[in-house]
Amino acid sequence: MLKKIITALGMSGMLLASSNAIAEDTKTKNDNLSPQSVDLSPLRNLNKLDSPMDKDYNYHQAFKKLDTEQLKKDMQDLLTQSQDWWPADFGNYGPFFIRLSWHDAGTYRIYDGRGGANRGQQRFSPLNSWPDNVNLDKARQLLWPIKQKYGDAVSWSDLIVLAGTVSLESMGMKPIGFAFGREDDWQGDDTNWGLSPEEIMSSNVRDGKLAPAYAATQMGLIYVNPEGPDGKPDIKGAASEIRQAFRAMGMTDKETVALIAGGHTFGKTHGAVPEDKVKQAIGPAPDKAPIEQQGLGWHNSYGTGNGDDTMGSGLEGSWTSTPTFWNHDFLHNLYNLDWKKTLSPAGAHQWTPTNAKPENMVPDAHKLGVKHKPIMFTTDLALKEDDGFNKYTQEFYNNPEEFKEEFAKAWFKLTHRDMGPKSRYIGPWIPEQNFIWQDPVPAADYKQVSTQDIAQLEQDIINSGLTNQQLIKTAWDSASTYRKTDYRGGSNGARIALAPEKDWQMNEPAKLEVVLTKLKEIQTNFNNSKTDGTKVSLADLIVLGGNVGVEQAAKQAGYNIQMPFVPGRTDATQAQTDIESFNYLKTKSDGFINYTDGSISADKLPQTLVEKASMLDLNIPEMTVLVGGMRALDVNYDNSQEGVLTTTPGQLNNSFFVNLLDMSTQWKKSDKKDGEYIGIDRKTGKQKWTASPVDLIFGSNSELKAVAQVYAENGNEQKFVNDFAKAWHKVMMLGRFDVQQ
């Protein structure tokens, strides 16, 4: 049914394929690109160029002038100020705004941290026109007077999430808190969202199923088809798809049940247009709507086009008799009414009770005195029929207060998961409670090291017997887990010493243990020697060790540099580390150290390097200088010599670029190893070097070659070292929100 009409109003996360999955997916935008045509767009920060804000605009500073209590009051007043151009169901926009917030935050995917409410991407194409977001353009338009009033002091991305949170509270579901701090984008991002609506409707698509890397289970839907898999009312099949989709958002079964049951306590779904009139009555989505509609889409020519004639998902009705008040009637109806399969006016599969009593009847959303039977989706009934979900629906049904508490926690997680650690939160309503999904690190309860202490520790590291390569690679492996998409990972917390990171193949566990043991010994000796409360964390020592390695390698090449070091990192505990969640930070390839687990084809490795660099918030020159420096430093995974294009391995110099661009070398594919290239001396025919596709891309791709040439030029040797040091420090500081506010 939903392929004929506008796709359903799901209640969370159309997640995107992970960055590694994107590199492998045959449907990606880079599908037809050869390695030399690697897409560098992820490294271009066009949002800064497109921003209309002043260069010195700082959201955190602008927020300080916001009257949050007045903003909240204005939002509460708006909920019951029904507008003729889009009347509020039941006289309250609360359920509408909950859906707005949910669909905004629900795009988050745990695989690579993309999606979510941060940056306000729902305002832009393609999300603003995604079928599951039908009519949410009107919800954002309803918020415009408030945004206009408060201006730069509140971002769209904060306002959209706040709208749903205030709505919950106004309808009797007190949230556990709310954090401001989301900043706005100014253009739609170029993330691989899957297929276009046209492709979705194509008969050539494989039964509408999405590959496992996507959190949604059917194309065009935010998470699952509420009618059931492929529009078939298969309750058990629906349960499987719900679990797949919500786990891809990082939600447990308990959180999944709380969110669906709690969300469906409110509001209604819309399918008033008769099935045979849908195609003619409903206009195009916002990105294809006529210009005179001013960004509003899905124009409905049936009846009044709104109110009781509203067309959305195609399903029609409400779940409870009190759709603007929090209670556990959804669960009561789920267990106490007998549900029979039926069709909505628009022809969508849904369920209505055969034994509804007067107290179960639902008031009409717009006509006084008119009543309707409650409804359920196929996916709702799955919460009862599936054993795993049933455990929690029964538990919540019998314990209404627990249900309320678990929904509040799950809502906070849904709407804040993509914001990163708690140190990024701002505002007066931040809950005191910490959650493991926030990747907490303890606050420092000791005095930070002084400049003199740092000098002593550097000498201790030099005297430890650890090589520069050991120190550099350990620091890189620790810091390079960072993801700018959801602000997870990085050096803070020293989680490279904890499960699961300490056991990752790319971190070479046996070698890592040698380094960590020695650094812990230095840490213990130093901390025991101090009597003034000064301590150093392992996290800081790992980074300091990397700095020492870089400084020593530069010195060996004839350059004296002093790496900046900002102490303050603390060490997380194993209890503060969700092993399953952190495993999503594990990469399948890291081109900076020429690592791959073998699951990605060689021709896709240059693109995964770009994706990795993008996650580290690097630009093209920074990526380039880091790769060249890491090769010269000889810190490849497993001591591989691929790309170590230097006769002075371990010294920080520009040899990689000089030798890569040397025309006395001819490159050929190896006939012994897939993805390996052999550098042959043109005169003697003897082998000089080996390299990976990642290495050769810097001489093959025209843009990367232009940057590589700068670093290979005579007179730019010191520039190369300085630029490497700056880029290295940037990576080491990723995730240090405590000093970047």
UniProtKB/Swiss-Prot annotation:
Annotated SUPFAM superfamilies: Heme-dependent peroxidases (SSF48113)
Obligatory cofactor(s): heme b
Cofactor binding summary note: Binds 1 heme b (iron(II)-protoporphyrin IX) group per dimer.
InterPro entries membership: Catalase_peroxidase, Haem_peroxidase, Haem_peroxidase_sf, Peroxidases_AS, Peroxidases_heam-ligand_BS
Annotated S-S bridges: none
Gene Ontology cellular component annotations, sorted alphabetically: cytosol
Oligomer status and interactors: Homodimer or homotetramer.
Known role: Bifunctional enzyme with both catalase and broad-spectrum peroxidase activity.
Identification of the protein by name: Catalase-peroxidase
Species in which this protein is naturally found: Francisella tularensis subsp. holarctica (strain LVS)
Gene name of the encoded protein: katG
